[in-house]
């Protein structure tokens, strides 16, 4: 391997899990890729000319999770208020949710609801991901 490759590998070995997740998100945004997408020819057609019958059907995702990844310490109160409005969490549960990140705030919601929640949380100062 080249020196540059070795340096990058050493840096990757030293980062935290949260930093690795942020790195993956940035790579996905920068290069327009999806890290969860399979790479290569993992799909094999059935033998005997049944290729059309075994065609891969791609279903569009209909439910999404809203995940708070980070909240700046000076933005915790506004984010806490939004979390309480979006969920049925009481004050103590909402506070625990925004201090133990990343945390799924909404699960199995529609794309429109997820986008609306993301906007509210980001406007309050949170870093949010939809998956």
Swiss-Prot record:
SUPFAM superfamilies with a match to the protein in the record: ClpS-like (SSF54736), Ribosomal protein L7/12, oligomerisation (N-terminal) domain (SSF48300)
Domain of life of the source: Eukaryota
Entry's Gene Ontology BP terms: translation
Residues covered by region (Disordered): 107-131
Keyword Methyltransferase: no
Keywords recorded for this protein, A-Z: Chloroplast, Plastid, Ribonucleoprotein, Ribosomal protein
Entry's localization field: Plastid, Chloroplast
InterPro entries per UniProt: Ribosomal_bL12 (IPR000206), Ribosomal_bL12_C (IPR013823), Ribosomal_bL12_C/ClpS-like (IPR014719), Ribosomal_bL12_oligo (IPR008932), Ribosomal_bL12_oligo_N_sf (IPR036235)
One function term, GO molecular function aspect: mRNA binding
Bias kind Basic and acidic residues: ranges: 110-131
Gene Ontology cellular component annotations, sorted alphabetically: chloroplast; ribonucleoprotein complex; ribosome
Family from the record: Belongs to the bacterial ribosomal protein bL12 family.
Subunit description: Homodimer. Part of the ribosomal stalk of the 50S ribosomal subunit. Forms a multimeric L10(L12)X complex, where L10 forms an elongated spine to which 2 to 4 L12 dimers bind in a sequential fashion. Binds GTP-bound translation factors.
Functional summary from the UniProt entry: Forms part of the ribosomal stalk which helps the ribosome interact with GTP-bound translation factors. Is thus essential for accurate translation.
PANTHER family given in the database record: 39S RIBOSOMAL PROTEIN L12 (PTHR45987), LARGE RIBOSOMAL SUBUNIT PROTEIN BL12M (PTHR45987:SF4)
Name the record gives this protein: Large ribosomal subunit protein bL12c
Organism: Chlorella vulgaris (Green alga)
Taxonomic placement: Eukaryota, Viridiplantae, Chlorophyta, core chlorophytes, Trebouxiophyceae
């Amino acid at each position: 391997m080249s020196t540059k490759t070795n340096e990058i590998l050493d840096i990757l070995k030293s980062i935290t899990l949260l930093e690795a997740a942020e790195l993956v998100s940035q790579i996905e945004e920068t290069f327009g890729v999806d890290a969860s997408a399979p790479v290569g020819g993992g799909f094999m057609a059935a033998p005997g000319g049944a290729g059309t019958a075994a065609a891969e059907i791609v279903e569009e995702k209909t439910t999404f999770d809203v995940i708070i990844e980070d909240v700046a310490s000076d933005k915790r109160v506004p984010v806490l208020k939004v979390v309480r409005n979006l969920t049925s969490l009481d004050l103590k549960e909402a506070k625990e949710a925004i201090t133990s990140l990343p945390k799924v705030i909404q699960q199995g919601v529609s794309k429109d609801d997820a986008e609306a929640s993301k906007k509210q949380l980001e406007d309050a100062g949170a870093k949010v991901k939809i998956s």
